[in-house]
Amino acid sequence: MKDLFLFSSLLDASHTFSYFFHIGLVALIAVIVAMMATRSMQLVPRGMQNLGEAFLEGVLSMGRDTMGSEKGARKYLPLVATLGIIVFFSNIIGIIPGFHAPTASLNLTLSLAIIVFVYYHFEGIRAQGFVKYFAHFMGPIKLLAPLMFPIEIVSHLSRVVSLSFRLFGNIKGDDLFLMVILALVPYIAPLPAYVLLTFMAFLQAFIFMILTYVYLAGATVVEEGH
């Protein structure tokens, strides 16, 4: 099956150009939406400001439930909300004919996963100290430390694979699904598919955000008795 037409191919047909073109487009859309939401701030929010505040409050509520505190939720709100915006717009743009979802490429999903991986370890070390943070990797029983430490290392590395491939696989699958639907029935029938794919774009962004909060909570929240 041939690839669907992409507007970026009018400038350059290479996959590398297409990837960076759509990444740049997502960044531009995010900036425009942010400017619209903050252009004329009012005490009683309306329009885009209302939508933006609802989004941030939703992310903050997610953070409170995951981190267990308002302080932790607010501290990581900029990172988690930014990741959510990038992932959502990268997902949703692929639903529009003539555009390609950047999250259907491992280049983006793996990059985002590595950012989360490095950052939550950095925050964990900063919150607990280097020795205490990695002492948790050895488990509560010292005799089992030689076994538990490599298992924990593999477990944490697998989070990069989980974050990146889950998002990549779902969005790539959505792209292929949409391509088949448009090839078979290009007019009225794809409408239910667009609804489903829009829901999936929201869902994958939500999952990425909540997993980021979960990993940050696991790294920075020190349980009593440890």
Curated annotation (Swiss-Prot):
Its main location: membrane. One of its GO terms (biological process) is proton motive force-driven plasma membrane ATP synthesis. The keyword NAD does not apply. GO terms for molecular function: proton-transporting ATP synthase activity, rotational mechanism. It is a multi-pass membrane protein. It comes from the Bacteria. The chain crosses the membrane at residues 17-37, 79-99, 105-125, 134-154, 176-196, 199-219. It is found in: Cell inner membrane. InterPro entries: ATP_syn_F0_a_bact/chloroplast (IPR045082), ATP_synth_F0_asu (IPR000568), ATP_synth_F0_asu_AS (IPR023011), F0_ATP_A_sf (IPR035908). One of its GO terms (cellular component) is plasma membrane. Keywords: ATP synthesis, Cell inner membrane, Cell membrane, CF(0), Hydrogen ion transport, Ion transport, Membrane, Transmembrane, Transmembrane helix, Transport. The keyword Membrane applies. Key component of the proton channel; it plays a direct role in the translocation of protons across the membrane. Belongs to the ATPase A chain family. F-type ATPases have 2 components, CF(1) - the catalytic core - and CF(0) - the membrane proton channel. CF(1) has five subunits: alpha(3), beta(3), gamma(1), delta(1), epsilon(1). CF(0) has three main subunits: a(1), b(2) and c(9-12). The alpha and beta chains form an alternating ring which encloses part of the gamma chain. CF(1) is attached to CF(0) by a central stalk formed by the gamma and epsilon chains, while a peripheral stalk is formed by the delta and b chains. This is ATP synthase subunit a.
